[in-house]
A protein has these predicted regions:
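Surface-exposed, low-hydrophobicity beta-strand/loop segments enriched in small/polar/acidic residues
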Residues: 1-139
Length: 139
């Protein structure tokens, strides 16, 4: 009898709903972005992760359709086990992550003088890495 594949992403998931950041009255998150990493952009508002942003969680759903700008809300997985796309510098198992470009995450920078007054921006713990494609994180 072989070892069963584990569906860790079903463990301890917590979801929250946020408004979507807009640029020129157009939502910054679209259906194509489902599954990407997101960051908090202002009070109760999210957008795609950008370089060195704080990784909030994974976009799992959007209400309505892409055509209904300003009326949609985003459901974000903010806790539990999740898999998201990665970019350079790729994290390794045991690392923490920060936002990368275009809705990805990357290895968190070393602690130091660059940390903001509010604290270190690194989040989660990487528990698996799939080459240079994605990583699985527990938050």
């Amino acid at each position: 009898m072989g070892v069963r594949d584990q569906n860790l992403e079903a463990l301890g998931a917590m979801y929250a709903t946020f408004n979507i950041k807009q640029t020129a009255s157009v939502d910054d998150l679209k259906d194509i972005d489902i599954g990407k990493a997101v960051t908090i952009t202002s009070g109760y508002q999210v957008g795609p992760c950008t370089d060195n942003s704080v990784f909030l969680g994974k976009l799992v759903d959007l209400t309505l359709t892409d055509a209904e700008n300003g009326k949609r809300v985003a459901t974000i997985q903010i806790k539990g086990v999740m898999t998201v796309s990665i970019t350079t510098t790729n994290p390794v198992v045991g690392n923490r992550v920060v936002g990368g470009a275009s809705g990805t995450v990357k290895q968190a920078p070393a602690l130091g003088a660059s940390d903001p007054a509010g604290g270190n921006i690194a989040r989660g713990t990487v528990i698996a890495v799939n080459g240079t494609t994605d990583c699985t994180i527990v938050m």
